[in-house]
């Protein structure tokens, strides 16, 4: 990877065209913009309406956590004194400084991004919160946006709320098909503005489970430079990679090899590796974009919870980066075993009735139901929502992951929570539902052998 100091960083003014009209018109919070000045030595602040910490009833917070190196061992961590006071008080919009500092170090260690090189980090109430704000500060109503298809269902309403024109980029088992993306951009009408953003989940994509290969990532980055768009890299399953090959570099890391740096806005989540309910995620990317997101935060929810950030920092600081790495490796191995159990049941019950590709990261199987002799036909909606549910199993029909809707024979199934016996029962019930529909369609069980190895998008 090229030395970061040899790379040209896009200037702040470059991002003016990527900031939405609403974000440009948003008036900054007069109080929050001045809060950093309270820390200037000698300044007596009469600025903020902060409650006096002496009135808070909490005096100490202790919690126990498993050791990342020995899960049978626990340690008790305590937050009190000035640490607790900071956790109970209003804090900086971008985040709790000790945690921000820790995250800066993490992004340096994992992605090769050094602090002070034109990028910053902001905390959010989960990565979903940050994605919502990023879209709103970058996209104007009616804009065309590039989204991989199938796509994470949680972003579709965000784009729909802005009446966006969702341009579907084809994917397969290797991630975004760069040939599809190139065709879209090269054939774009000359009288219409090109999309400013591309949304993608490169590791263990939700719903497909696909992980983008290194070659595909490089091709997408090249197209981002050629056609001038920002990659929204939503990577909640980055730490849940369990493939046989070494983990591919992120877009955030790979862009250091580009002639210019600053076309990736990255979203990380602690939900899958520490706690979903603690609601903490962080965004890393160009300062101009993160500052616009911070302005949105300052006039909406003000900040991410200081207390949850203080708890997370206390834990991570006690672990060190090495302990964090060990913990995430343990989590990814846990889900690899879950994947294998689920796939074993699929081979047992769905051979000849479904097609799938084995995921290398994440929590999901994405499989195609063979509901009729014509394998290109079929709609999983009735099979899953009605037939399968009547038999006692819930899964999600694939239509909910298509940016512009429509029938599809695909289904998403999560394997994160279910034990081995329930997995066996659930997949057997899906088999029974498929057979019921095939009988209505006048076909029986397919006997041509296992089909799971094919890329089936």
Put a short name on every predicted segment.
Residues 285, 366-376, 393-428, 433:
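Conserved PLP-binding active-site segment of the aspartate aminotransferase-like
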